[in-house]
């Protein structure tokens, strides 16, 4: 009998990373994806400005328009209502994938859609977002741009023969390019892709995403501008206990994140109880947005100018309080309705407003500094991406001095949210659709352990010279050693000749055999799957699945002599052992 064994078990073939020349192909494709993402970001910004000017100022212009100091008439309440009605119609008759803030939809495409996004999403998502935001929706442009950039990356990938994992890489690359073009934060965009979208840390995905983000930052001076989006130069010199104060700000930000997320999904549940089709929900939310705009126009639209004012320390306490309350209410009500908009800018604005309020009781630092720290902490806690939020704040402002304060605040906020909430604002939506995912990256024990660590030995085997009648008697008697469904068969030298099971014996009994026929003769020269002691457990498990076998004989690589056996239960024990090591708490060193 011939043996089918792994050719990948040798240490000479093992590497830290599973990269190959496909990495270069994906990196080349990412050059195009980065360009797509950058231009998509520019297009969406212009569309938002066009709709804003047309809806509020009755001017057909693509130049950026702010609503912060607009003098709105009571009739302006109907502008967000009309915008919500149009978005609802697009969602129902165009594509329901435009609903939401973009990132959960991109995650769903990655997890269950094999990283395929429909072409119409690339059209309707930016258009619906421009209408929603341009008519006063209290959203950022980054979520829709991430979804649009991801859609373009996915569509581009579908023109080539790529695997689902490779399409995922280009989807994330397009998303990173869109975020980079808006904010000028390539490193944070790459980290966002890693912390939230890719679900892996591999050169295959990391390098193309970096390429795409760098291409986008190269386009940015011509499309958006070369300067940091929000300039900041007010970082104080922290006393030794200053980082503790930053941690306290982070804890408050974590509580704010938990409250905001809980409120969002509570309001969404109330919408679902309404006797109205979801198409009408954005229009209904538009009424609340319109009233909020009359109270504080600064809460409407993208609000990048408000973020700059908060960071610059130009917002008074009462204005920050009004902005926080109005922005939080209209954002939660509007986003829960299923309209199209982003989360990053609103989170930054609400976090910054709380930071301004905190600055009046904290012992050092201006309101702009604490607004910036609180912004990053709220972002890191709500999205559960503390590294992204930290680097994002530094790149966004161009102020490296804030790094220690930001990272401790983001870590504290992250710790609070993971302890208080089961899921983030991104994953809760997926969980409600029956999709659970985890963001914990650990070393796979199947990749670390070798077959020798889990194989059963010594092994009870049947000899090839055993007669068929004797073999049948072995399976029928149920002797003490006979407690498995299948057994290896070995020749006189101990080399594996095959595997024989109860099912085989039943089939052969029906077929009949010659009186003098042996097991070895019956097995003949058919191929048998074997493993080697030095093989990785993961490799062996993959081959067992492919061959649909439950037990594999383990042989010495050079001699072919049987030395062990691996069954499915041995593989399950590997997972059980990993869980046991995670849960065990042992004192390794004595204190005295």
Regions flagged by a language model, labelled:
Residues 391, 497-505, 563-571:
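Short hydrophobic beta-strand motif reused across regulatory alpha/beta modules
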Residues 447-461, 466-473, 504, 516-528, ...:
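Bateman (tandem CBS) regulatory domains
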Residues 462-483, 490, 507-512, 530-557, ...:
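The conserved cystathionine-beta-synthase
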């Amino acid at each position: 009998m011939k043996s089918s064994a792994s050719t990948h078990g040798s240490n000479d073939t093992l590497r830290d990373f599973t990269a190959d020349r496909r990495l270069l192909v994906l990196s080349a494709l990412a050059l195009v994806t980065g360009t797509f993402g950058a231009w998509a970001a520019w297009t969406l910004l212009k569309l938002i400005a066009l709709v804003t000017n047309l809806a509020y100022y009755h001017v057909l212009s693509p130049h950026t328009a702010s609503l912060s100091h607009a003098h709105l008439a009571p009739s302006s309440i109907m502008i967000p209502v009309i915008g919500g009605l149009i978005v609802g119609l697009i969602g129902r008759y165009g594509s329901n994938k435009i609903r939401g803030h973009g990132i959960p939809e991109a995650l769903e495409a990655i997890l269950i859609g094999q990283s395929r996004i429909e072409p119409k999403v690339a059209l309707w998502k930016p258009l619906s977002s421009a209408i929603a935001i341009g008519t006063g929706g209290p959203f950022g442009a980054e979520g829709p741009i991430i979804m649009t950039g991801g859609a373009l990356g996915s569509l581009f990938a579908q023109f080539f023969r790529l695997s689902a994992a490779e399409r995922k890489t280009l989807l994330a690359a397009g998303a990173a390019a869109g975020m980079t073009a808006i904010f000028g934060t390539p490193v944070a965009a790459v980290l966002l892709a890693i912390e939230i979208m890719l679900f892996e840390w591999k050169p295959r995905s990391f390098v193309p995403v970096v390429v795409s983000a760098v291409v986008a930052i190269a386009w940015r001076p011509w499309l958006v501008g070369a300067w940091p989006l929000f300039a900041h130069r007010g970082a104080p010199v922290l006393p030794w206990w200053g980082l503790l104060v930053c941690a306290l700000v982070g804890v408050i930000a974590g509580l704010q994140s938990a409250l905001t997320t809980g409120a969002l999904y509570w309001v969404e549940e109330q919408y679902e109880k309404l006797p109205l089709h979801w198409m009408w929900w954005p229009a209904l939310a538009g009424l609340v947005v319109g009233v909020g705009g009359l109270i504080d126009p600064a809460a409407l639209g993208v609000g990048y100018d408000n973020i700059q004012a908060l960071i610059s320390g130009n917002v008074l306490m009462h204005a920050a309080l009004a902005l926080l309350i109005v922005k939080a209410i209209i954002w939660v009500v509007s986003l829960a309705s299923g309209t199209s908009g982003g989360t990053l800018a609103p989170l930054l604005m609400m976090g910054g407003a709380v930071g301004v309020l905190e600055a009046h009781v904290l012992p050092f630092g201006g309101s702009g500094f604490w607004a910036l720290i609180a912004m990053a902490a709220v972002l890191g806690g709500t999205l559960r991406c503390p590294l992204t939020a930290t680097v994002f704040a530094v790149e966004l402002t161009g102020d490296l001095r804030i790094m220690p304060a930001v990272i401790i605040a983001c870590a504290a906020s992250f710790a609070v949210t993971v302890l208080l909430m089961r899921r983030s604002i991104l994953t809760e939506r997926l969980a409600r659709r029956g999709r659970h995912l985890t963001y914990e990256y650990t070393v796979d024990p199947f990749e670390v352990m070798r077959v020798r660590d889990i194989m059963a030995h010594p092994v009870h085997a049947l000899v090839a010279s055993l007669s068929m009648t004797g073999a049948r008697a072995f399976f029928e008697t149920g002797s003490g050693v006979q407690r498995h469904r299948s057994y290896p068969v070995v020749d006189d030298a101990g080399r594996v000749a095959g595997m024989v099971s109860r099912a085989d014996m039943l089939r052969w009994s029906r077929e009949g055999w010659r009186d003098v026929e042996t097991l070895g003769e019956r097995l003949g020269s058919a191929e048998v799957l074997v493993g080697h002691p030095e093989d990785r457990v993961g490799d062996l498990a993959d081959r067992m699945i492919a061959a649909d076998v439950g037990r594999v004989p383990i042989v010495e690589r050079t001699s072919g002599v049987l030395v062990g056996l691996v069954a499915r239960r041995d593989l399950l024990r590997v997972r059980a052992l990993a869980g046991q090591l995670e849960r065990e708490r042992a004192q390794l060193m004595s204190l005295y």
